[in-house]
UniProtKB/Swiss-Prot annotation:
Organism of provenance: Dictyostelium discoideum (Social amoeba)
Record localization: Membrane
Keyword DNA damage listed: no
This protein's name: Protein zntD
Task performed by this protein: May transport divalent cations. May participate, with dstA, in the regulation of the differentiation of stalk cells during development.
Pfam families recorded: Zip
Biased composition regions of type Basic residues, renumbered to the chain: 120-129
Membrane topology category: Multi-pass membrane protein
Amino acid sequence: MGISLSVLDIKIISTTVLFILSLLAGIAPYWMRNLNNSSRYLSWSNTFAGGVFFGAGMLHLFATADEDLQPYVQKYNYPFAALCLCVGFLITLFLELIINSIFIKSNTFASLHGHSHSHVHLSHGHSHHGKDNGSNGNPGSGVGIGMGSVGALNSKKNKTTSPTITPTTPSEGTTTTTTTTTATTAATAKEIVLEDEDEDEEKDIMDEIIIPDDYDENDDEQIYKKKQSKCARTKFRKFIDTIPTFSSTSTSSTSSSTKISEKQRLLDSSNSYYYNQNKYKGIIGSHIDIDKSGSGVGGFSNNNNNNNNNNNNNNKNNNNNNNNNFRTEIIIQPISTTSNNSVHHYPSSSVNYHPFITTTTTTCSNDNSNSNNNNSSNNNSSSANITPNTNKILSSSKSLSYRYNGDDEEPDIIIDYDDIDYNQEGRTRGNSLGSDSNVHNERIVLINSGIGNSGNIGSNNNNNNNGGGGGGGGNSNIDYNDNEENNNNNNKIESEILIKDTTTDSIKNMKGGEHQHQHLHQQEIIVVTKKSNILLPFILVIALSIHSLFEGLAMGVQSSEIRVFDILIAIFAHKILASFALGISTITSSNEKPSFLKLFLLVFVFSLTSPIGSILGMVIVGSGVTGSMVPPILQGIASGTFLYVAVVEIIPKELSHDSNDILIKSFLLLLGFSGMAVVAIWV
C-alpha cells in the first residue's frame, strides 16, 4: 500500500530537503580551498557562478518580472520590467560607491601611493599625476619608479653571531668588483624586530646621519641642511637585526683600494648607523620601509652604466652582462602582528636571506665623463645581489600592495592577490607602503625592479604621513642631476629590467618605464575593487533572498500537486547552484582568510528564505498580495543586482585572469548560463 502525501506534506518535506541541500552547497567552497590548486578551482567555480547569476538574472528573474508586469505595461505603455532592472543595477552600483567613499577616501589613496618622486626628472612617476612633496598625491602618483629607500635604519650587529663578509670597493674608474655571499642553512634563530625609538634619542639623529662618499657639501650646502632639518624632525624607527651565520665566497678582480665605503658598511650591517634616505643616489631599494613618511619600496639598483652616449646598444650590452642581480626574490613571513607601536618578528625559516648582506660592490664614483671602454662602468651607487630564496615563490613577475595605519586598532591591509596571481608577465611594480608602515601580511614576494644608478631615493622626508609610492620597474632615458639646471646628456641612463617568467622559467628583457602608465590605472582599479568586494556577499544575500523568498511564496500558494512539483524542480535546480555561487563569492571576495562562521551565517540566511516564503505563501493564500505589483517589481530589481554581480564583479575579473584557463573558464561560464536556461523551461 503506497504512502499518500498531501500537498501540505509535499511542501514541508521539499522545503526541508531544499534547506539542507542549499546549506551544504553554500559551505562546500570553504573546504574546496584546502585542495591542491584550490585557488584555480575556486576561480573556475566562480566563473561558473557568474554564468549562473547572469542566467538567473536575465532568464528567470527578469523574465518573470516582465511577464507579471505585462498588464501594467499594456495599460501604461511603459517597460516597467526594464526600468526595475536598471534600478537594481544602479542601486547596487551606487551602494558600492557609497561604501567606497566611506572606507576608501582620497587620503587613503595618497597614503598608499604617496608622493611623486619629484627628484627623478623625466620619469613616469614625475609625469603621471605627480605632486610636490608638500601635498597629497592622487591615485597613481608616486608609482612607477623601480626604487625605494632603506628608510631610517639602525642595523646592529649581534655580538654572538656575525656575518663573515669580505666586501671590496674598487676605486674610481676601475672595473666592477663582485662579492658574492651565500647563506648557509641557519641553525641560529633569526628575527627582525621593528620598534619605536625612544623620543629622547631623536636628538642624536643629527650626529648619526651618514654622508655619502660622493657628496659635495660645498655645492649643495643649503639642500643638505634642509634635508638634515627634515630628518631631525622625523620620528624614526629602529631596525634591529640578529643575523645567522653566513659563509662568504669572493670572486673579484684586484682592487686598487680596499677602503670600505659608508654605503658598503651600511649594507653589510657591520656597525650601527642611522640612514637618511635622501642622501644616497640610486642605492638599493628595501623590503622594509620604516621611515614615518616613507618613500615606498622598490627594487635593487644594479645597472653598470656605460656613459658612452653615442652608442646605446653598447650600454644595453653592458647591462645585459650584469643581469644576474635581478634574478632574485625575497620571501618574508611574519609570525606575529600587534597593533600600533607594534613589534614584528620574522622567523629564520621564512627569511633566509638578508637584503643588506649579500652585495655586489660597484664603483662609487661621481665621474660623469664619457668612456670609450664598453667593458668598464662608472656607477653612482652600490647595488645588492640577494641569493635567490630556495622556497617556492608565489610569483616573480607580479607584486602586491598593502597599507598599515598605525591609528587603527587592527592593521588595515590591502593585498592584491589578483595582481600577484594573474597579471600578465612584464607588468611588475614595487611594493607600496603607507605611513607608519611595517611588513606584516602573511607572505610577501618582492620583485627586483631596479631603477639603475640614477635618481634620488624617493621623496623628501616630510611629516604629513604620506607614504611613498614604491617602484614599478626601472626607467628609461632618465636625466638625473642634483642641480636641475645642470642636467646634461652625460647623466642619461637607459636601464633594463629582467622579469622572470615562472611559467616558462625564462628571463624577459623589458624597458621598465614603458609599461607603467597602463599598470598604474590597473592598480587604482584593483584597490577599489578589493575594498568594494567586502560588501559583495551581503549584496548577493539580499538579492538572492528576495528572489528565493518569492520562489518559496510561489510554491506556497499552489494547491495542485503537479504545479508544486514543477516549481519545486525549478527551485531545486536554481537554488542549489545559487547557494554554491554565493559560497564561492564569499570565499573569493575577501583578501583575508575566509571565516567559516561568516560563510555559514550568510548561507544559512539565504537557505532559510525559501521555507519562509513557502510558509508565507500558505498563510496569505487568497489575500491578494501575490497579485499586486510588489513581487514583480522586487524581482525586477533583483534581476538588476544579478546582472551587476555577473557582468561587473565576476565575469570580467575571472576572464581577465590566467590566460591559460581562458577556454576552460569560457566553457564553465556558458555551462552555468546554459544550466539556468534549461531551468527556465520549468519556470
